[in-house]
Amino acid sequence: IFDKADEVLGRSISKMCFEGPEEDLKQTINTQPAILVTSIAALEALREKTGVKPDFVAGHSLGEYGAYYAADVVDFATAMKLIDKRAREMNDAATKTKGAMTAVIGMSKDSILDVIGKVDGMVSVANYNSPAQIVITGEAEAVAKANEALKEAGAKRVIPLPVSGGFHSMLMEEASVKFSE
């Protein structure tokens, strides 16, 4: 699977996955294809060992592409090419903007929305992972201010995420438009 990914992408994502360096792997342009190929490799290992074929699949964001593959909606090469294009567009948008993301744990949705609504700058909810964990996103400075305000307002934990951009925010609008073309 990893060799096929290298061939489709025209670069060694396998070497990056197995040998690093970590700094290269953390770049959006590499992270997304690496996660997808690893997810597909895990799926194929499970299929080979158990013969399991899912009745339905689901995925969120990058995970949608693994779900498309698992459901036989797209073949491997198409999935990898799509995610490579997506990663490139998001990487370009992230380098043009200074964004950040934070996981907020132990605070209600309404309280989080109230706090971030009072912060100057662009900050919004990216993901409702569970009732106990919500991810915020936006301009790095606004997210940093929101982090402090959320701590002061009683969030149990405020965890800045090690990402290279303000994904799932308006900072990615350009990437969304280009990817849809």
Place the predicted regions along the sequence by residue.
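Helix-rich "cap/lid" substructures immediately adjacent to catalytic or cofactor-binding pockets
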Residues: 1-58, 136
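Alpha/beta catalytic cores of group-transfer enzymes, especially the acyltransferase/condensing modules
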Residues: 7-11, 71-181
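A short small-residue
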Residues: 18-25, 66-67, 157-161
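Short, glycine/charge-rich beta-strand/loop segments that flank catalytic centers
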Residues: 22-23, 58-62, 87, 99-103
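Residue-level recognition of oxygen-bearing side chains
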Residues: 30, 62, 141
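A short acidic, glycine/proline-enriched capping/turn motif at secondary-structure boundaries
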Residues: 42, 64-65, 89
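Glycine-rich nucleophile elbow surrounding the catalytic serine of serine-hydrolase chemistry
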Residues: 60-69, 73
